[in-house]
Amino acid sequence: MNYKQACIKRNIELCILFPFVLLGKILGHFIKPRQQASIFLFFPSADIGGSPKVNATILHLLKDRKPLVIFSKKPSNNGFKELFDSANCTIIDLHKLIDNKYYHFINVIYRGIISSWINKSPKAVVMGGECIYFYKIIPHLKSSVKKIELSHLNTWLDYNQAFIKYIDYRITSTPNLVRNFQIQYKNNQVPEKYLSRLSYIDNWVDIPPYKEKKASTLNVLFVGRGAAQKRVHIISAIAEQLMRANPAITFTFVGDVASFLSPYVLSNATYLEFVNDKDKLYDLYDQADILLLTSAFEGLPIVIMDMMARGKVVVSTAVDGIPDYIEHLKTGLLIKEIKNEQIIQENGVELIEMLFNDRALLYKIGLEARITALQKFDRNIFEEKYKALFS
């Protein structure tokens, strides 16, 4: 679907749903939010993941201004609930009302209710962190409301192009995604005036003191969700091949990925479904030598940043934003094949065996990765840029 078609589809939907939205706006005068706010943050849920972690980081950055957080999607695990709750801000979880296809009209009515809250708020600022409901709300907001979109993946491009004209700032977490937007704008004949609204802000991570790890074994770590894009079954195949051949190579899996692991890997690797304790998770990072990812698509996972900050070597498929930060044989190792799973498996095995046999290279790449993290993942720059957006 091109830009013009997306806009036509959007306008038809807005016309059809107008009576329900209008009803919601009327109800919004009687249904009051639990807290008056000038900042409204739309997030899908508090599930574990890189994107929700960034959302929580932004919430904590703004907590003194008491933003209102709206969750719209049924959570899978709510693993970051405590992280969001610890900001001591008002959170309205609407998923039981608006994430149900059997009474979708309530979803539409709430667009009117919430937009009326926002439109009545002086100097309102609205941000959507990969949240579909954000796009449903913004056509109903006054032009004076500042609207900010945060994206980490290019999987949203076809959907959100219909809402380009409503968004004042389109923020991505990698330069690659900005390039994706620019290509889309050109191919779909999006007016050039909207290009100036694109920019990226690198996420930040803590840079802990460097700990040199000396051991005869080599520990390979995977951290992530059990999502299809992660292709954990490939990592399982790599792990089984390496562990059967060399007992000194060990694997640790963190995430809800048991169903993707072979019986051999489940029996012989370390497996932890969830690690909510941040210190325990960081201990696992420190104990590892390598982070292995074989994703089909990614933005820049926070775990990559965390591992680079610790001087660990990232071995990953060269997808999307990752090559902007991982330079092969300098700051990490890239698997250039991204489609043929057998070749990905073979390359992954070869690269890990190479690092096992060449500890000097492992050490050298790890130090270069840490230097890159120090340069790019700066907390002060992150905070200054986001505070400026919400000013």
Please state what every model-predicted region is.
Residues 50-57, 227-241:
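A conserved mid-protein helix/loop that constitutes part of the nucleotide-sugar donor-binding site
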Residues 137, 157-160, 168-196:
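A short, active-site helix/loop in glycosyltransferases that binds the activated sugar's phosphate group
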Residues 91, 260-279:
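Nucleotide-activated donor-binding/catalytic signature segment of Leloir-type glycosyltransferases, i.e.
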Residues 283-288:
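Short alpha-helical donor nucleotide-sugar binding micro-motif in glycosyltransferases
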Residues 313-316, 326:
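Short hydrophobic beta-strand element within catalytic cores of glycosyltransferases
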Residues 13, 18, 29-35, 45-48, ...:
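N-terminal strand-loop element at the rim of the active site
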Residues 296:
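Aromatic "clamp/platform" in nucleotide-sugar-dependent glycosyltransferases that forms part
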